UniProtKB/Swiss-Prot annotation:
Post-translational modification: Carboxylation allows a single lysine to coordinate two nickel ions.
Enzyme class: hydrolase
Record-given protein name: Urease subunit alpha
Urease domain location: 134-590
Keyword annotations from UniProtKB, A to Z: Cytoplasm, Hydrolase, Metal-binding, Nickel
Residues annotated with N6-carboxylysine modification: K222
Length: 590
């Protein structure tokens, strides 16, 4: 039987089982766990498009029509990186969703084909490229619409949060307050080739004004200290969420005016809640908001300005906080408020808590102390830093926060030749976990059959920093594209340009607007004149930290109020600030 060298095979068809590759300029090494293209029985039946290649009439392209099962688009030889596993496979898309993951080809001439390529099938060649689900940023201040282009260009395809533009309230808090503002933002969402969902304002001691926001289409409610995150407001807001199957996002009381972290935990009363700013400097009860990392009903997340901890982190934060929260440096109390939130000890602990899987999600806090285009980049910088400082990460024992794991990957994860488990843990922080937390995992968050085809392609050398292609609902929405007047697509200047999926009526068919079940049932789509596909959030109120994939660790947390030292299960958490990081200047010379 004819053979081919492993390197030559990888260069032609992409890596296969046992092959390893480096993620950009990080120290993270990925290993392929399984190869679904081998369902044909052996190597040699791979599909590939091009002159003299196999996807031709009568070869790997069948005669099947769409009605006979041919897919709309096939992604060939993709290296799928997902929290559930790292596998090589072909991906078939139909009707804007992932229809199949497996072996593509012509069932009349090939064995094991579960994705039919027909005359009506488009091909996206993924040989040598990494494929991930589109990222989810669940902490968006909708301050300006230009954020959306930057987020999409970074690989984020779903943005959840609140705001109305550069209003003073939105500059500080992620709330779209009231039915009128919610309606306007849902109408604006029709213009953008990303999935959007809006949080109403949850700060109220009576339920009426909160119910009307959910009825208007808000996917949940945001409690922010700048509006008064009192125990009464927290409890009332959660009462409404329980009644409407929506999420509550909490930015708790930094000043401890209306209570301490213990009072907030008591007000939550064991109900599920998204704890935004469960972190070292972003806000919430000072200095011990990290206590909630050990609570089973709190779903903790970080924003990216403190991630990872570097020697520049502390210096930039005071001025940044003063601007974002409408503070005055000439007022001593305002300055003290700002300085109380910025603690190097808790910032350092935040990195380690992410590596332990104790903080479950990453987000941006866009233009309100966070950078909307750097969620993915900073997640992988943190993973790299933690490998440098803490070494190889072993998977936890069964039942200790391991989350999902493909059968193929269970053995590979324990091999010190690769960082597969750490990769899955960090990937889950901005894909499947925010999807689960906000009730949208039935639509997005992973590469899985039936889900919306929000897919990002990466060349390994640019992984995490500059995607090659971004698909929304099965259609290319954004791409790194060369000079449109050139004779081929690659000449300089190459930069991100909107593609056909980002224009006209295609936006409405390829992107989702998330709304409440109450809003969908009330017919807000027709009433507001919305064009986008609407999808209701669901299954939220039973979600607990145990449901956070690869990030469900519940340590006993201790934070010293005087020294700010952080301990998890008795272990002191501290690390040095980074002085140099990957995915940085090397990628942004031009």
């Amino acid at each position: 039987m004819a053979t081919i060298g492993r390197r030559a095979y990888a260069e032609m068809f992409g890596p296969t089982v046992g092959d390893r590759l480096r993620l950009a300029d990080t120290g993270l090494i990925l290993e392929v766990e399984a190869d679904y293209t081998l369902r044909a029985g052996s190597y040699g039946e791979e599909v590939k498009f091009g002159g003299g290649k196999t996807i031709r009439d009568g070869m790997a392209q069948a005669q099947h029509s769409r009605a006979q099962g041919a897919v709309d688009t096939v992604l060939t030889n993709a290296l799928i990186m997902d929290a559930a596993g790292i596998v090589k496979a072909d991906i078939g898309l139909r009707d804007g969703r992932i229809a199949a993951i497996g072996k593509a080809g012509n069932p009349d001439t090939q064995a094991g084909v579960d994705i039919i390529i027909g005359p009506g099938t488009e091909v996206i060649s993924c040989e040598g490229q990494i494929v991930t689900a589109g990222g989810i940023d669940s902490h968006i201040h909708f301050i300006c619409p230009q954020q959306i282009e930057h987020a999409l260009a970074s690989g984020v395809t779903t943005m959840l949060g609140g705001g109305t533009g550069p209003a003073t309230g939105t500059l500080a808090t992620t709330c779209t307050p009231g039915p009128w503002n919610i309606e306007r933002m849902l109408q604006a969402a029709d213009a953008f080739a990303v999935n959007l969902g809006f949080l109403g304002k949850g700060n109220a001691s009576l339920p009426g004004a909160l119910h009307e926001q959910i009825d208007a289409g808000a996917i949940g409610l945001k409690l922010h200290e700048d509006w008064g995150s009192t125990p009464a407001a927290i409890s009332n807001c959660l009462d409404v969420a329980e009644a409407t199957d929506t999420q509550v996002a909490l930015h708790s009381d930094t000043l401890n005016e209306s209570g301490f972290v213990e009072n907030t935990i008591a007000a939550v009363g064991g109900r599920g809640i998204c704890a935004f700013h469960t972190e070292g400097a972003g806000g919430g009860h000072a200095p011990d908001i990290l206590r909630v990392v050990g609570e089973a009903n709190f779903l903790p997340s970080s924003t990216n300005p403190t991630m990872p901890y570097t020697h520049n982190t502390l210096d930039e934060h005071v001025d940044m906080l003063m601007v974002c929260h409408h503070l005055d440096a000439s007022i001593a109390e305002d300055l003290a408020f700002a300085e109380s939130r910025i603690r190097k000890e808790t910032i350092a602990a935040e990195d380690i808590l992410h590596d332990l899987g104790a903080i479950s999600m990453m987000s941006s806090d866009s233009q309100a102390m966070g950078r909307v285009g750097e969620v993915i980049l900073r997640t992988w910088q943190t993973a790299h830093k933690m490998k440098q400082q803490r070494g190889w990460l072993s998977p936890p024992a069964a039942g200790q926060g391991a989350g999902l794991s493909s059968a193929a990957g269970q053995g590979v994860d324990h091999d010190t030749r690769n960082d597969n488990f750490r990769i899955k843990r960090y990937l889950a922080k901005y894909t499947i976990n925010p999807a689960i937390a906000h009730g949208i995992s039935h639509e997005v968050g992973s590469i899985a059959v039936g889900k919306w085809a929000d897919i990002v392609l990466w060349k390994p050398a640019f992984f995490g920093v500059k995607p090659a292609l971004i698909l929304k609902g099965g259609q290319i929405a954004l791409a790194a594209m060369g000079d449109p007047n050139a004779s081929i697509p690659t000449p300089q200047p190459v930069h991100y340009r909107p593609m056909f999926g980002a224009f006209g009526g295609a936006i409405a068919k390829t992107s989702l607007t998330f709304v409440s079940q109450a809003g969908l049932q009330a017919g807000i789509g027709q009433r507001y004149g919305l064009r986008k596909t609407l999808s209701a959030v669901r299954g939220i109120r039973g979600i607990r930290k145990r449901d956070m994939v690869h990030n469900s660790y519940l340590p006993q947390m201790e934070i010293d109020a005087q020294t700010y030292m952080v301990r998890a299960d008795g272990q002191w958490l501290s690390c040095e600030p980074a002085t140099e990081l990957p995915l940085a200047q090397r990628y942004f010379l031009f």
